From Swiss-Prot:
Organism of this sequence: Mus musculus (Mouse)
Protein name (database record): LIX1-like protein
Residue pairs linked by disulfide bridges in the UniProt entry: none
Gene name of this polypeptide: Lix1l
Family as reported in the entry's similarity comment: Belongs to the LIX1 family.
Spans annotated as Disordered: 1-55
GO cellular component: protein-containing complex
Low complexity: compositionally biased ranges: 26-38
Pfam families, per database record: LIX1
UniProt biased composition (Pro residues): 39-55
Any GO BP: actin cytoskeleton organization
Length: 337
């Protein structure tokens, strides 16, 4: 019974015969899938555009810790970031400049030393986008999984790294403010705003089988956590929604509560990414060009969010999954030649 339940909750979209364990296994087809074997039967169509999600379910949503108006103007954003960075003046080098890369790392090491639950340690990870000429772009991933990127025109790789560290440091600092914690008051305010936005009623908020009810359930399950911690969790659900996996789970008769309970305790890992990539391989084989169109759209969204100083993990994970799918397609084409 437990095995069947786990199979139904796998993130693969899955098509093919129903009522068997094989049909409920991860992947994009009812038959076993390998990199060199075309899928059997009609693959799933690309998911429709995602409808608006409740507040705090969007990457870079208002609940994330950016100063008021910071995302509205590049100049205001730069000023806000510099103000936070200057507060770390003890981390100076040369002519009074702040070593933001060092400051960001030290900030998270300090959090760990004070008892923060950092499952993968306090290491801050930087990733440069391959390029032979400016502007250079750098992403930084914080220990919890939140991702930020260089938000300015960066003529050097070192400047891109510093730019990414600045925006990550600002968000890390603001995230420590008490107003960034999920409290009973915050939950009531957020649910009321969601009800108003979607013309819902109070009964919906109390029913975990509705969208707003599920939103409330997620907030209450994460009471006491910060906005960044909550956003890291919601990235998994955003990806499941984007990929069409949530719809597939409903078709497998998974209740909303089952899905929430299962994925609230599952980190985003290579297994989830691989299964979603297989879904996009199947879509591309069914609708040639679907993958390249989605990738182009995702890259635009990622760049816009990066330049606005927003949290980027949802957009970046989408791009990584699509690039993984493109690589798998390339391997399949090479092996068939």
């Amino acid at each position: 019974m437990e095995t069947m339940r786990a199979q139904r909750l796998q993130p693969g979209v899955g098509v093919g015969g129903r009522g068997t364990l094989r049909a409920l296994r991860p992947g994009v087809t009812g038959a076993p899938t390998s990199a060199a074997t075309p899928p059997v039967g009609p693959p799933p169509a690309p998911p429709p555009p995602a409808p608006p999600l409740p507040p705090l379910l969007l990457a870079g949503a208002p609940g994330l810790p950016l100063p008021p108006g910071a995302a509205g103007s590049p100049a205001v954003l730069r000023e806000a970031v510099e103000a936070v960075v200057r507060s770390f003046a003890k981390h100076t080098q040369g002519y009074g400049r702040v070593n933001v890369v060092e400051a960001l790392q030290e900030f998270w090491q300090m959090k760990q030393s004070r008892g923060a639950d950092l499952k993968n340690g306090a290491l801050v990870v930087y990733e440069m986008v391959p390029s032979n000429s400016p502007p250079y772009v750098c992403y930084v991933t914080l220990p919890g999984g939140s991702c930020f990127g260089s938000f300015q025109f960066c003529p050097t790789k070192a400047e891109a790294r510093r730019s990414a560290a600045k925006i990550a440091l600002m968000n890390s600092v603001f995230n420590e403010h008490p107003s960034r914690r999920i409290t009973d008051e915050f939950i009531e305010k957020s649910v009321s705003e969601a009800l108003a936005s979607f013309n819902g009623n109070r009964e919906e908020a109390d029913n975990p089988n509705t969208g707003i009810g599920a939103f409330r359930f997620m907030l209450e399950s994460n009471k006491g956590k910060s906005m960044l911690e909550f956003q890291e969790l919601m990235t998994v659900f955003q990806l499941l929604h984007w990929n069409g996996s949530l719809k597939a789970m409903r078709e497998r008769q998974c209740s909303r509560q089952e899905v929430l309970a299962h994925y609230s305790h599952r980190a985003l890992d290579d297994d989830i990414r691989h299964q979603m990539a297989l879904d996009w391989v199947s879509r591309e084989q069914s609708v040639p060009g679907a993958l390249s169109r989605e990738l182009a759209s995702t890259e635009r969204e990622l760049d816009e969010a990066r330049l606005a100083g927003k949290e980027l993990r949802f957009h970046k994970e989408k791009k990584d999954i699509l690039m993984l799918a493109a690589g798998q397609l390339g391997n399949m084409h090479s092996s068939s030649c």
